[in-house]
Amino acid sequence: MLSELGFPGLLVGFALACEQFVAPSRVLFGQISDAHPLAQRHRVPYVLLGTALFCSLAVLSVPLIFRVGSLLQAGIQPALGLAIAALCGLFGLYGLAISLATTPYLALVIDRTTEAERPRAVGIIWCLLTVGIVIGAVLISTSLRDLDGITDPAVLEPALTAFMLRVALAVFAITVAATWAMEPPALGRRASGVGPREDGVTLAQAWTLIRSSPQVLIFFSFLILFTLALFLQDPVLESYAAQVFGMPIAATAQLNAFWGVGTLLGLLVAGVWVVPSMGKLGAARLGCRLIAASLLMLLLCGLTASVPLLKVVMVLFGLAAGIGTNSALCLMLDLTLPEVAGTFVGVWGLAQALSRALGKVVGGGLLDLGRLLSGSAAGHSPNPFPAYALVLGVEFVVALGALLLLDRVNVHQFREDTGRSLDQVLVAESL
């Protein structure tokens, strides 16, 4: 959209952010999957429905994007405004479909595992997710190689539409295969043997459960700070490597690969060894400390402008992120009730989605503020490092804030509060 079609950066950013703006729907979809089974199943039908919807919307996005591009070139009003609104609306619907697919999926992980099994299950799931992203990126890059250098919309649109259709069909087929026989018919019991799911819990009652324990707000706030500590630097990392370390564009793009390798190792190590040996809270504390230390190293290595050191730090940062992510996800899955697992997963997913969106905005805003304060924006200072140091410094403080909040998380207190509230809800419903 930015290069071939010449879309304004603000338009691209806002359209993509529309996917995050609908994040509150995760709570609703989680509660719906708790209370309303489809085809006698609470999770898999919603996963398949959401997948079918976001695959269809992905295919529809291609002609709409090219339509907006042609109207931008022609400057036709008011058709351009309507097309932009339609594009933003489509990305919003795409976000709804993603929420519909992913929230019941995470609830299914809770339904199908015990507390002891979850660290390893989470590690395997997120490792395979990372591997899948890498394989998908390689396959997409290889498949679109013939389109390199082509900017003619008349050639690009039919080629990309056909390509997206093939990808959508493949994604849906893989999803069907992956979820086949993963959920038994809803007989009112979880696969792990915990008691019946109460289909009568309404959205209002679920909201009562969410507000019943201060631990919900504490962990919600922790997830926001933790996710910000991971991704606040994301929108400025490549420019940090280019301007401070003098790396070429192709090399800066490879930094994500170093981070990804570290994350993969961290997820495996956490799932197999760290979480089982230290416990979920202990592993989460270790992850937060390692993330804070990695951010400090990322800041300090900018003083040396050493590219090899930067690559090592990115691997260490990924390792810390993997350990922290695994333990935080295990905590997230523990801080639920079996009867309303989807609802609580939706709440935690909302925290993560909001913080990812906030990270994109705040990261870029802090960089602009740093440039303004250091004078580099006006050309008064030739040194770009102080502006990036502000971003990384704030991110370091955010990681420490997440660590402090983590000390207040109490899984036992959460279960006691929400369990008592659930009993009251069910008693009131039976009267």
State the predicted function of each range.
Residues 48-80, 289-305:
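C-terminal ends and interior cores of transmembrane alpha-helices
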Residues 78-89, 96, 100-101, 105-106, ...:
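Intracellular loop-helix junctions on the cytosolic face of multi-pass helical membrane proteins
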Residues 284-328:
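C-terminal transmembrane helical hairpin of 12-TM major facilitator-type secondary transporters
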